[in-house]
């Protein structure tokens, strides 16, 4: 399997898994760089023959390949309107090879009320301080994409105020895992806030916890768990 085909297959699988977990809706986008290449693979604006896209049935053939500037190179579908998120982030962050733009329900709520989304769940220690990008609009221009990348800085995730999230990873598996944990932390922080004042993971404690809960072994375990879960329910073969 070529690098391009492997990226396409993993990205399409991520679409289906994220949809199964309620994390990827009709407007969410995920993309990845092809190893050793400036090209990117993205889920499309719409799926051929339709007026929309359904991540639950996304296949490798549905995905679109674009260059570093977001121009279409290959694919039966067209790039999404928010492609500048990906061109901006990938241009800024050489360590990032996968970028997910998700409209996470619980995480996004924190940007709506202006409350910091802090790590309270041990597997969310990797996020640390989460920046908030104040532009709530669709990110459709190069200028907006660059601004998102500037707000993200060296973080693993950011909140787009009243819009959604941008979550990045060294590869598709890590971006997927980070997305699951980011939303789980938001749910736990919300629930804990109903009971009292949450104890935040910070400083040395957070750093030490992140070292133990965010590594290749943990990422692989979580990625494979969701694959097996979907297989056990007959959603993927």
Task: Label every PLM stretch briefly.
Residues 1-237:
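Glycine-rich flexible loops
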């Amino acid at each position: 399997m070529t690098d391009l085909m492997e990226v396409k297959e993993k990205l399409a699988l991520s679409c289906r898994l994220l949809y199964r977990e309620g994390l990827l809706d009709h407007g969410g986008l995920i993309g990845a760089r092809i190893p050793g290449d400036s090209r990117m693979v993205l889920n499309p604006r719409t799926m051929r023959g339709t007026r929309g896209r359904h991540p639950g049935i996304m296949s490798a053939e549905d995905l679109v390949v674009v260059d570093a500037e977001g121009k279409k190179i290959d694919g039966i579908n067209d790039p999404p309107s928010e492609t500048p998120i990906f061109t901006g982030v990938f241009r800024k962050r050489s360590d990032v090879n996968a970028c997910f733009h998700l409209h996470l329900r619980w995480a996004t709520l924190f940007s709506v009320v202006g409350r910091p989304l802090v790590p309270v769940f041990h597997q969310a220690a990797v996020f640390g301080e989460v920046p908030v990008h104040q532009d709530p609009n669709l990110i459709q221009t190069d200028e907006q994409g660059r601004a998102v990348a500037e707000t993200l800085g060296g973080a693993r995730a950011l909140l787009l105020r009243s819009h959604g999230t941008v979550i990045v990873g060294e590869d598709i598996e890590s971006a997927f895992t980070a997305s699951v944990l980011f939303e789980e932390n938001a749910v736990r922080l919300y629930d804990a806030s109903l009971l009292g004042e949450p104890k935040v993971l910070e400083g040395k404690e957070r750093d030490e916890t992140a070292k133990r809960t965010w590594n290749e072994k943990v990422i692989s375990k979580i990625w494979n768990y969701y694959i097996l879960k979907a297989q056990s329910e007959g959603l993927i073969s």
